[in-house]
Amino acid sequence: DFNVPQNKETGEITSDKRIVAALPTIKYLLENGAAVIACSHLGKPKGEWKEKLTLAPVAKRLSELLGMEVIFAKDIIGEDAKAKAAALKPGQIMLLENLRFDIREEKNGDDFAKALSEMADLYVSDAFGTVHRAHASTAGVAKYLPAYAGLLVEKELSVMGKALDNPARPFVAVLG
């Protein structure tokens, strides 16, 4: 989940906490020979391309954190993304442009989900904050590819499970 807070004037990332949280899964995949295609939404562009909501600054920050190039696709399922995905080698990572620049993402458009899935061999869900959403990049893609939980999702589920299975008393749960 790279939906990170940004400075409204400059577009500069003001907290990279969510990017850092994704690093264990990304590093695990890269170190084990995967070619990684990362994707995320940023903000609510409602299907329109908006420069302030591009994921280019996220690709730059992710590159700094990983200490390696993060290839950035200037589209989502267009020619740039497809060509870069096809050329991706094991141990390389690419980030697609903001998924919500395409209106079909939030509508769980089957054709959009299918096009996303055609660039990959499997799907790793590592955005705990979005797993409940029936969007093309989550529920839709999982219809076409073998799907797995990433390390962050696994960690969140483990923490929740422990809290619910054997909570310290007194115990109050507020879920939203």
Kindly give the residue locations of the regions a language model identified.
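Active-site loop-to-helix "anion-binding N-cap" substructures in soluble metabolic enzymes
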Residues: D1-G176
